[in-house]
UniProtKB/Swiss-Prot annotation:
SMART domains: RL11. SUPFAM superfamilies: Ribosomal L11/L12e N-terminal domain (SSF54747), Ribosomal protein L11, C-terminal domain (SSF46906). Belongs to the universal ribosomal protein uL11 family. This is Large ribosomal subunit protein uL11. Keywords: Methylation, Ribonucleoprotein, Ribosomal protein, RNA-binding, rRNA-binding. The keyword Phosphoprotein does not apply. InterPro entries: Ribosomal_uL11, Ribosomal_uL11_bac-typ, Ribosomal_uL11_C, Ribosomal_uL11_C_sf, Ribosomal_uL11_N, Ribosomal_uL11_N_sf. One or more lysine residues are methylated.
C-alpha cells in the first residue's frame, strides 16, 4: 500500500546552501520532517548547480518520511545570468537593462523544457522571450 501524503511543500532554495534556518526550518518543522536529513540530501543533489536558485517540491508522508523533486532554475534567473545583469528593469517598456541572443533563448528553453507546458521548442522559446521582455531584457538576432 502506498504511503499517505500529509503535505506538499514548495520552496526555492540556493543550490547546495540549504540550512535549517528559515524558510526551510519552519516549513518542514510544521510537518515533523527531519530538517537536517532534508538539508543534507538537498545540498548533495544540488552541489553541482552552485549559484542558481533551485525550486524543490517536498512530499511529506504520514510516517514523517519525505521525498522531493528538483525543478529547473526559474527562467528569470537563467535570463539574468545569460544577460549578465543583477536584476530586471523597474520599467521594462521604457528602459532596457540588457540583451540576449536568440541562441541564448534557445539554450534557456532547452534547459527549462521539462518544467514548461510547451509542446515544442519554438513555443518554449517564445515563453522565455516573453519573460525576458517583461524583465526589460531585449532579445536580438
Amino acid at each position: 500500500m502506498a504511503k499517505k501524503v500529509v503535505g506538499l511543500i514548495k520552496l526555492q532554495l540556493p543550490a547546495g546552501k540549504a540550512t535549517p534556518a528559515p524558510p526551510v526550518g519552519p516549513a518542514l518543522g510544521q510537518h515533523g520532517v527531519n530538517i537536517m536529513a532534508f538539508c543534507k540530501e538537498y545540498n548533495a543533489k544540488t552541489a553541482n548547480q552552485a549559484g542558481f536558485t533551485i525550486p524543490v517540491v517536498i512530499t511529506v508522508y504520514q510516517d514523517r518520511s519525505f521525498s522531493f523533486i528538483l525543478k529547473t532554475p526559474p527562467a528569470a534567473v537563467l535570463i539574468k545570468k545569460a544577460a549578465g545583469i543583477e536584476s530586471g528593469s523597474g520599467v521594462p517598456n521604457k528602459n532596457k537593462v540588457g540583451k540576449i541572443t536568440k541562441e541564448q533563448v534557445k539554450e534557456i528553453a532547452q534547459t527549462k523544457m521539462p518544467d514548461l507546458n510547451a509542446a515544442s521548442l519554438e513555443a518554449a522559446m517564445s515563453m522565455i522571450a516573453g519573460t525576458a521582455r517583461s524583465m526589460g531584457v531585449e532579445v536580438v538576432d
